[in-house]
Amino acid sequence: MGFRRAMALAAVFVTGFILCGTLAFQAVPAAAAETKTGVGLSEHALMAYRDGWKYQYGNYGQYTNGVRSTDCSGLVKSYLWWRGNDCDPEPNLVSVAGSSQSMLSSAKVKGTIRLSDSSTLPRIHGLILYSPGHVGIYVGGNKSVDNRCTGENVKYGDVIGGNYHWTTWFKLPQVSYPENGFVTFDGNQYYYENGQYVVDTSRTIDGVTYTFDHNGVMSSSN
């Protein structure tokens, strides 16, 4: 009886340990959700363009016949819902407005684009570009990425002087945009001041002089 009682107590102890371990494990807070950034959105958009994603209404980056596809707002959602290259995005991983118009309506920071005036387009990676019924992504250097034509690939082209009439830019509320300091985008260095990357200028920072070209890319340092 003594042996059996000892075994029973041991079983209770082990069970309690496992349960406590489980409870303790469950009590550990999950890692904070990845911060979504304007630079990250721009990198994601370029990836979609370079990988040949297709247009499919209602999609947000799912694989179809071995190729990912989205519609215009789905391209934005695919970044917010991204879980990696080996799986489909997870809908509602981040709460976001559904359509291009509702995305615009949800934005608190926005402005008008005049295609004859490049100064009306802020130098900010990851801005959302809007035209009635359509959205795209600004990736800097006067370039946009968007998905608009059934069966065709993601598009890449000029904003000012391009063949698509963008009317409005806005900041997506779910995305954090650069304010000050260096950022790396597509393998190049940019320097932000007061919320925009600098162009056609030099800056001396911590004793080092950096030169930035007309697209904002750091071209030299000494």
Feature annotation, model-predicted:
Residues M1-A10:
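Bacterial Sec-dependent N-terminal signal peptides
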Residues A10-T22:
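Bacterial N-terminal signal peptides
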Residues C20-T37:
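Sec-dependent signal peptide cleavage junction
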Residues A24, A33, S105, S119-T120, ...:
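Extracellular adhesion/carbohydrate-binding repeat motifs centered on closely spaced tryptophans
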Residues A32-D88, S131-H134, V145-N147:
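N-terminal capping segments
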Residues T35, V39, K77, N85-Y156:
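...with weaker cross-activation on analogous glycine-rich loops/strands in unrelated enzymes
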Residues R83-V96, P173-P178, G216:
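Short, well-structured beta-strand/strand-turn elements
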Residues G162-P178:
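A recurrent domain-boundary module in secreted/ectodomain proteins
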